[in-house]
Regions:
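A short acidic, Gly/Pro-enriched loop at the edge of an enzyme's catalytic core
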Residues: 21-32
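Conserved SAM-binding strand-loop segment of SAM-dependent methyltransferases
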Residues: 5-19
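Conserved class I S-adenosyl-L-methionine
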Residues: 59-86
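A SAM-dependent methyltransferase catalytic signature shared across enzymes that methylate proteins
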Residues: 100-119
C-alpha cells in the first residue's frame, strides 16, 4: 500500500529489525526507519542489527520509550509495578534508559546529529484520549487489549515517568 502512494520508492522491506543481517540486500540503505516497534527490544540489539545495513552517513529514525529524570527517585516497589505494567505491553523495563544514556549509546554506535523529540502527548495521551472518545466499547479479545493499552498509555502519560520519543541520528563516515 505504501508503494502505491509513493511509487518513486524503489523498494520497501518489511522484516524483523533484529535479523537484518540475514537478509541479502544488494546495497546498504541511506535511511532506516523503525516505526512504533524498537522499544519492544534491547536498544543495543536493535542498533547492532541496523548498523549492518545502513550506509556511512546514513540516517536512522525510530521510536523508543525512555525513562524520565524523575525515575531514579522511585522506590524499588514503584519500579517493580512499572516493570509488570510494561511487561504486559511486551516491553522490558530493563531495556529502557534515560535520554542521556540513550544518546551515549547511539554515540557508541558511531551516530551523531542525534535528535530526541518527546511525542508522549501526541502518542500516549492521544491514543488513550481517542479510545476513551469512542462511542461504545467493542466486544472481543482485541477490544480488551486495545482498552488495556489505552489505560497503560494514559498512566504513562499522566505519571510522566516513561516517555514516548522519536529519535533521529546520522551515521558517521568511517
Amino acid at each position: 500500500q505504501i508503494q502505491q502512494h509513493l511509487p518513486h520508492l524503489v523498494a520497501i522491506h518489511q522484516h524483523s529489525f533484529l535479523n537484518l543481517k540475514q537478509i541479502q540486500f544488494k546495497t546498504a540503505f541511506d535511511v532506516v526507519l523503525c516505526i512504533d516497534a524498537a522499544y519492544h527490544s534491547n536498544l543495543n540489539s536493535f542498533l547492532a542489527s541496523v548498523c549492518t545495513v545502513l550506509n556511512a552517513k546514513g540516517r536512522l529514525g525510530f521510536h523508543y520509550l525512555i525513562l524520565s529524570e524523575q525515575w531514579s527517585a522511585l522506590t524499588t516497589l514503584q519500579k517493580q509495578k512499572y516493570k509488570w505494567l510494561l511487561k504486559s505491553a511486551d516491553v522490558n523495563l530493563d531495556d529502557l534508559m534515560t535520554q542521556s544514556v540513550l544518546t551515549q549509546t547511539l554515540q557508541r554506535y558511531d551516530f551523531s546529529e542525534i535528535e530526541v523529540v518527546d511525542l508522549s502527548k501526541a502518542v500516549l495521551h492521544g491514543f488513550s484520549h481517542y479510545i476513551q472518545q469512542l462511542p461504545q466499547p467493542q466486544i472481543g479479545l482485541d477490544a480488551v487489549k486495545i482498552q488495556i493499552t489505552a489505560k497503560l498509555c494514559h498512566k504513562l502519560y499522566v505519571d510522566g515517568l516513561v516517555q514516548y520519543v522519536q529519535i533521529s541520528a546520522k551515521k558517521n563516515a568511517p
